């Protein structure tokens, strides 16, 4: 007998919705803080106990909720943020689905006190989504929500939570992203009474970066900006010399909403291409503004994923912006960076520093009990000199056209070789200090730019071979090369069918090195075979990188003084002489002042 179809109760529906909206304590924090942001808050306090499993309290000074709307706010799909279908495609707020409050309330004990500031406040208590009590009371403008006993009625959910440090890390990550997205809001986050994050809310994104990642990272960040008809981008990109082992430090924010988008991450990585070592990732924060109609945020209840109707155009704008920004800078790392980088890489954790030199916006006292316990810094917590450096850091001003042209002509100064170490590193000097150059990386960069230009030209000037080259392949590779023939022609390899599983090559580009033609052809073909599908752009790029690496001088290769001079002079003509195509540094500098400090000649 067929089972009857019945309508689910509201309580059960809310529990099902909670499975998508409220996965862990961090989900509760995210939804409630986003509500506070949408309410126009300028100060938000987040108090968490035992990684949110014991209690989560969010206090804001936003607009509050009218007394007659308080109970309605806990009904599923009840919201003040959209009214009709048209509003759904022009969402300006972080929340709009009306699912967060009922979903959170359905799996916890929840108490909310709220006031619009024009009348008495309202207090409401719920357990498992059921209203236990609602009463009027005195409260200042804003809202306080306290969530306790999370997942008390869904014990299976507790089994899938991670350790307390992991859950706390998830909460911290969410709040870091929200703080980066809203530098004009003061966030104060504490765990078990201990402050973990505090931002000033003064609108300075760089100050937020300092509070989250540390002053040393903020000092290494440079402003980026770009604009098109559809997009306006601003933010900060940290110099390539400071990088991380994962993508967690890439923050993309669209219309005030932190989002995850693989295509935009790829675009950012493309912008850093050849500037970062393989397997390393940048630290960057991008704030992107666009018309809400070209971004669909109604993809998933968590609202982390979005669909962009002009994703490719945005990606190209981001990549070009990053490339142009770094092309204007001299990216020679100093010798001291090695120690700092090593310390950073030991933990690979987000470091937080709290600046005491800026006044923090006053937090509203909504209720009789204190919000955050007063924090009195100890001597160890006293601000160091470095904590104030951001105040006096020089700002990056756009260069004039003449300055940009001069920069482009000479990216690195004239250097005079004084010797070679282990037949691998060139030591050079000038009035600015000492330079150490990786000879392989230096020539690799030079040859990469040469091959990239030659392969990109697709010149039809070919050198006929007196003796054509015949290449045989296994059947599977032969079939794949048949499909790739057009792409190979774009990089100068012209294959003609020649018997079973064979190709004949009768000519090659004139720039191929003499007596290395067959080796070059095989290496380019191997590059095409290395990936199941490859674009012409990537094939050209990978081929240029491969050829430059194989054709450059190696370590343990002795050079004469004339050889070193020629290499350094040619390197000065490169468009980006600071890293090899794999992102490793070409040059490291020790300034005269740094050397004098090391030898205690200056203090």
UniProtKB/Swiss-Prot annotation:
A GO term for molecular function: ATP-dependent DNA damage sensor activity
Keywords carried by this UniProt record: DNA damage, DNA repair
Keyword match DNA damage: yes
Chain residue ranges for the region called Disordered: 337-383
SMART domains: DNA_mis_repair, MutL_C
Biological process terms in GO annotation: mismatch repair
Signal sequence coordinates: none
Biased composition (Basic and acidic residues): 337-347
Entries under SUPFAM superfamilies matching the protein: ATPase domain of HSP90 chaperone/DNA topoisomerase II/histidine kinase, DNA mismatch repair protein MutL, Ribosomal protein S5 domain 2-like
InterPro entries hit by this protein: DNA_mismatch_repair_CS, DNA_mismatch_repair_MutL, DNA_mismatch_S5_2-like, HATPase_C_sf, MutL/Mlh/PMS, MutL/Mlh/Pms-like, MutL_C, MutL_C_dimsub
An annotated GO cellular component: mismatch repair complex
Keyword DNA damage: yes
Gene3D superfamilies: 3.30.230.10, Histidine kinase-like ATPase, C-terminal domain, MutL, C-terminal domain, dimerisation subdomain, MutL, C-terminal domain, regulatory subdomain
Superkingdom in the source lineage: Bacteria
Functional summary from the UniProt entry: This protein is involved in the repair of mismatches in DNA. It is required for dam-dependent methyl-directed DNA mismatch repair. May act as a 'molecular matchmaker', a protein that promotes the formation of a stable complex between two or more DNA-binding proteins in an ATP-dependent manner without itself being part of a final effector complex.
PANTHER family: DNA MISMATCH REPAIR PROTEIN MLH, PMS, MUTL, DNA MISMATCH REPAIR PROTEIN MLH1
Family indicated by similarity: Belongs to the DNA mismatch repair MutL/HexB family.
NCBIfam families assigned to the protein according to its UniProt record, in alphabetical order: mutl (TIGR00585)
Identification of the protein by name: DNA mismatch repair protein MutL
Organism: Listeria monocytogenes serotype 4b (strain F2365)
């Amino acid at each position: 007998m067929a089972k009857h179809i019945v309508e689910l109760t509201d309580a059960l529906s809310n529990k099902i919705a909670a499975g998508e909206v409220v996965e862990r304590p961090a989900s509760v924090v995210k939804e409630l803080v986003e509500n506070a942001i949408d309410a126009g808050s300028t100060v938000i306090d987040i108090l968490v106990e035992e990684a949110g499993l014991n209690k989560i309290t969010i206090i804001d000074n936003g607009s509050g909720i009218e007394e007659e709307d308080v109970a309605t706010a806990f009904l599923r799909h009840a919201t003040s943020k959209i009214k009709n279908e048209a509003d759904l495609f022009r969402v300006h707020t972080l929340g709009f689905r009306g699912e967060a409050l009922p979903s959170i309330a359905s799996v916890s004990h929840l108490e909310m006190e709220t006031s619009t500031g024009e009348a008495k406040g309202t207090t409401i208590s719920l357990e498992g989504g059921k209203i236990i009590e609602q009463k009027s009371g005195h409260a200042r403008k804003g809202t306080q929500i306290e969530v306790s006993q999370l997942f008390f009625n869904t014990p299976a959910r507790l089994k899938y939570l991670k350790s307390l440090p992991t859950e706390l890390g998830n909460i911290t990550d969410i709040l870091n992203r929200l703080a980066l997205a809203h530098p004009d809001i003061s966030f104060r986050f504490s765990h078990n009474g201990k402050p973990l994050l505090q931002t000033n809310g003064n609108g300075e994104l760089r100050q937020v970066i300092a509070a989250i990642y540390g002053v040393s990272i903020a000092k290494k960040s440079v402003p980026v900006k770009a604009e098109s008809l559809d997009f306006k981008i601003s933010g900060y990109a940290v110099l390539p010399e400071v990088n991380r082992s994962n993508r967690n430090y890439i923050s993309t924010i669209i219309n005030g909403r932190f989002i995850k988008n693989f295509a935009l991450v790829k675009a950012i990585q493309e912008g850093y291409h050849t500037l970062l070592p393989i397997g390393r990732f940048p630290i960057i924060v991008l704030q992107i503004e666009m018309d809400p109609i070209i971004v669909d945020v109604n993809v998933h209840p968590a609202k982390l994923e979005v669909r962009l109707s002009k994703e490719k155009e945005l990606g190209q704008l981001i990549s070009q912006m990053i490339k142009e920004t770094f092309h204007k800078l001299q990216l020679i790392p100093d010798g001291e960076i090695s120690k700092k980088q090593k310390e950073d890489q030991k933990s690979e954790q987000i470091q937080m520093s709290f600046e005491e030199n800026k006044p923090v916006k006053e937090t509203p006292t909504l209720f009789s009990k204190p919000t955050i316990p007063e924090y009195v810094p100890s001597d160890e917590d006293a601000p160091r000199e470095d904590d104030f450096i951001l105040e006096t850091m020089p700002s990056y001003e756009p260069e004039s056209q003449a300055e940009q042209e001069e920069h482009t002509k000479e990216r690195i100064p004239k250097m005079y070789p004084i010797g070679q170490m282990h037949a691998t590193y060139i030591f050079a000097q000038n009035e600015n200090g000492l330079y150490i150059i990786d000879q392989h990386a230096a020539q690799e960069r030079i040859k990469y730019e040469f091959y990239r230009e030659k392969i990109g030209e697709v010149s039809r000037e070919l050198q006929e071979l007196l003796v054509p080259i015949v290449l045989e392949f296994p059947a599977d590779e032969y079939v794949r090369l048949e499909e790739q023939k057009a792409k190979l022609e774009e990089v100068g390899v012209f294959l003609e069918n020649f018997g079973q599983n064979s190709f004949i090559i009768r000519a090659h580009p004139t720039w191929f090195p003499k007596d290395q033609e067959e080796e070059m052809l095989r290496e380019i073909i191997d590059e095409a075979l290395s990936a199941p599908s490859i674009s012409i752009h990537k094939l050209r790029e990978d081929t240029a990188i491969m050829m430059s690496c194989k054709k450059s001088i190696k370590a343990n290769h002795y050079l004469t003084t004339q050889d070193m001079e020629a290499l350094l002079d040619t390197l000065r003509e490169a468009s980006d002489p600071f890293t090899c195509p794999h992102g490793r540094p070409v040059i490291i500098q020790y300034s005269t002042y740094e050397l004098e400090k090391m030898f205690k000649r200056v203090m």
